[in-house]
Amino acid sequence: KTNVTGIKTGNSGFSINGSKGSKALIETIMEIIFFVCAIFAVIAVAAITIYMIISGAPALMKVGIVDMLFNTVWQPTAAEPSFGIAYIVLTSIIGTAFAIVLGVPVGLLTAVFISEVAHKKVAAVVKPAVELLAGIPSIVYGLLGLLIINPLMYKLELAIFKDNPNHQFTGGANLISAVIVLAIMILPTVINVSYTSLQAVPVKMRQASLALGATEVQTIFKVTIPAAKSGIITAIVLGVGRAIGEAMAIVLVSGNAVNMPLPFNSVRFLTTGIVSEMSYSSGLHRQSVLCCLYSL
C-alpha cells in the first residue's frame, strides 16, 4: 500500500499515519528513554568523581597538596614515608607530549596517503591494516616493546654510556622505549579520525584548487588539511587521551621506577603507578595512590 505522501506501508508495517494520541504517547516514551540514558551517563561520571574525592581527600589533607605535587620522593612504605608525585606527573606530561610529537605527524601523513594519494587498491589494503592495529590489545604492544624495542634501546644505552661509571643501566626499559610504544599505539586513532575528516572535505574544493593551477601536494597542504582542521584536532585530542591513559603496555617497557624523566632513565607514569601499587597498598598509601587519579 502507498499513502498520500508516497510512503509505502503494509498491514503490519511502519506507517506515519496514526492518531494524535498514539503519536504523542510514543514521543513521550522516547523522550523519557533519551532522558534516562543521558542522566545515567551524568550519574556515572559524577559517581566516579565523588568516589575519587572521598577516597583521596584524606591523603591531601594529611600530606598536603604542595608537598605531594612538588616533592620528588615517592617512598610510601619507608619508615618515614614520602608521597611526592612530582616526577610521576612530569613523566606523564613529557611522555605523552613526545608520543604526540612522534605519532601525530606519522598518523596524519598516513591518513593523507590513504585518502588523497594511494591508489584505490593500495588504500583497500592499508586501511584495513590500520583498523586492525586499533583492535590489538595493549598488552601485545607492551610485549613487542619488551622483546624488540627494549633490547635495541639497551644496545644504544651501552654504546653511549659504556665509559660512564655513574650511569645506572636500565636494560633498555626507559623513557624512550615508553614514548615509542605510546606513539605506535596512538597511530590507529589519529589515522582513522584524520582519514574520516579528510574524506568529509568536499571534492569541489579540491577541484577548484587544481583548476586554479595548484599542484596536488599544494592542494593537500593548502586546501584539504586546513578544511579538515577541526577533525584533525579531534584526532590529536583522542590521541592524547589514549596516550595518557595507557598503563599495561607502558609498565612493561618503562622500568616503572620513580626517577627524573630523562631519556635513558627508568620512569613511572601515573597510570603505571596506580596499576603497580593499588593491589597491595592500604591506608594513607592507598589514598595517595588514588590521588594520582586527580592528576589524570
Protein language model features and the residues they cover:
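Membrane-interfacial helix termini and adjacent extracytoplasmic/periplasmic loops
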Residues: 62-86, 142-184, 254
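Transmembrane alpha-helix signature in integral membrane proteins
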Residues: 85-113, 296
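Transmembrane alpha-helical segments of polytopic membrane transport and secretion proteins
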Residues: 1-38
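Transmembrane alpha-helices
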Residues: 132, 136, 193-194, 216-251
